[in-house]
């Protein structure tokens, strides 16, 4: 038998039924679902120190359980001494079971470890049902060994859903247990 993540099982068993009732969908195919989660980190100092970018890629891979890809600058920015095509960050795109595992780990294990945590901003939707937020310290994830990190850095998380608007997307994420402050 194949392994099914807890959050995916919960989505299929409970969330779909609750959202059909709440939004009165005619078919369960209309119910919004998670499409992908993109976790990225920008390393501005990588211009001067390539070792920081390599450690960011390693940390991102440890956090997500999937190999991170280095990202390149789209255009040159003289003020930051960045040339076009220069590697300045890393990202991971999670889909399928890995996506549900990461979301579970984020909601139930990592975010509660943030000092003075009161929830994340519930207004950071983009109008198309996608939600983005930043995490200020990568050390909230248990996979990161505090003694072995080069420097404390933040990361960006974008949750892409099939919802057509923000209201449906927020309802979906609330059902998953996303700790919104408002």
From Swiss-Prot:
Pfam families: Ribosomal_L5, Ribosomal_L5_C. It comes from Borrelia garinii subsp. bavariensis (strain ATCC BAA-2496 / DSM 23469 / PBi) (Borreliella bavariensis). InterPro entries: Ribosomal_uL5, Ribosomal_uL5_bac-type, Ribosomal_uL5_C, Ribosomal_uL5_CS, Ribosomal_uL5_dom_sf, Ribosomal_uL5_N. Keywords: Ribonucleoprotein, Ribosomal protein, RNA-binding, rRNA-binding, tRNA-binding. This is Large ribosomal subunit protein uL5. One of its GO terms (molecular function) is tRNA binding. The lineage of its organism: Bacteria, Pseudomonadati, Spirochaetota, Spirochaetia, Spirochaetales. GO terms for cellular component: ribonucleoprotein complex; ribosome. Part of the 50S ribosomal subunit; part of the 5S rRNA/L5/L18/L25 subcomplex. Contacts the 5S rRNA and the P site tRNA. Forms a bridge to the 30S subunit in the 70S ribosome. GO terms for biological process: translation.
């Amino acid at each position: 038998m194949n392994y099914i993540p807890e959050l995916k099982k919960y989505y299929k068993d409970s969330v779909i039924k609750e959202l059909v009732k709440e939004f009165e969908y005619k078919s369960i195919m209309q119910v919004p679902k998670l499409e992908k989660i993109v976790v990225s980190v920008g390393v501005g100092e990588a211009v001067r120190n390539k070792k920081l970018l390599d450690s960011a890629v390693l940390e991102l891979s440890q956090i997500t359980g999937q190999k991170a890809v280095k990202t390149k600058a789209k255009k040159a920015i003289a003020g930051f001494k960045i040339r076009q095509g220069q590697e300045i960050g890393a990202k991971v795109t999670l889909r399928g079971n890995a996506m549900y595992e990461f979301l579970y780990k984020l909601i139930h294990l990592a975010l509660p470890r943030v000092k003075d945590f009161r929830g994340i901003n519930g207004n950071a939707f983009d109008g198309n049902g996608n939600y983005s937020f930043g995490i200020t310290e990568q050390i909230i994830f248990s996979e990161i060994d505090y003694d072995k990190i080069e420097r404390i850095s933040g990361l960006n998380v974008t949750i892409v859903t099939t919802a057509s608007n923000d209201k449906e997307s927020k309802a979906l994420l609330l059902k998953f247990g996303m700790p919104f402050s408002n």
